[in-house]
Design a protein with these regions (language model features):
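Helix-to-loop junction immediately C-terminal to a conserved catalytic motif
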Residues: 101
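Conserved ABC transporter NBD signature motif
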Residues: 109-117, 126
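Conserved ABC ATPase signature
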Residues: 184-188
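Catalytic Walker B motif of ABC-type/P-loop ATPase nucleotide-binding domains
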Residues: 209-212
């Protein structure tokens, strides 16, 4: 993705820039071209009455005072849109996810969900609308069987078992896991476990879906 973006910005990527991994690539020579391209690129216009599903306004955050991790972050995502955030390790991608979910709180700025400020919303209240798939599936999975893991959130909310079965099967098919529906999680590869966690969030039908390192193990 980052190499494609550089090419669209008119950058001539060379082998000496070490483009194999974004963590090792020399990006400094291209920053100005990318910034200019980003500012000029036109995005599809949305209807005036449409509210963004998620909007981040002038967001600042630091773990240590005076050492900002995120500064002046501003973006909006409309319903049905996808946004990829690419950066080196430690750039603040997971930190941004944690801010949106309410695990940590910004030093400055606002996060709006469907036009409403969610600063006073609890983690549980945000979780009703925002689904987060973490980088490491082993940090999410708590049930030994695949079906039970994907069904857990629905059962906790008291969804009837017939509906649970229907919704779980649907998401397992989407994630390519239906043939393994009665398997133990321990029999899966890391990448397959990642898909189990994606299915367990999709089954809850969140308004916003955040995938932290979505291609890990795939």
């Amino acid at each position: 993705l980052y190499v494609t973006a550089l090419k669209h910005a008119g950058c001539q990527v060379a082998a000496k820039d070490h483009p194999q991994h974004i963590e090792t690539m020399h990006l400094e020579p291209y920053q100005e071209k990318v910034r200019t391209w980003f500012e000029k690129v036109s995005l599809p216009e949305t209807q005036a009455e449409e509210k963004p599903a998620l909007e981040v306004l002038d967001l600042d955050f630091s773990y240590i005072t005076g050492k900002p991790i995120l500064s002046d972050i501003h973006f909006r995502i409309n319903k049905g849109e996808m946004l990829a955030i690419v950066g080196k390790n430690g750039a603040g991608k997971s930190t941004l996810s944690n801010l949106i979910c309410g695990f940590i709180h910004p030093d400055h700025g606002k996060i709006l969900l469907n036009g409403s400020d969610i600063a006073d919303k609890s983690i549980k209240e945000r979780g009703e609308a925002i689904g987060l798939v973490m980088q490491n599936p082993n940090q999410m999975i708590s049930k030994p069987m695949i079906f039970d893991e994907v069904a857990l959130g629905l059962r906790v909310r008291g969804v009837p078992e017939e509906e649970v079965k229907e919704r779980v099967y649907e998401k397992l098919k989407i994630c390519g896991l239906y043939p393994f529906r009665n398997w133990p999680v321990s029999a899966l590869s890391f990448g397959q476990k990642k898909r189990v966690t994606i299915a367990s969030i999709l089954v809850m039908n969140p308004e916003i879906l955040i995938l932290d390192e979505p291609t890990a193990g795939q």
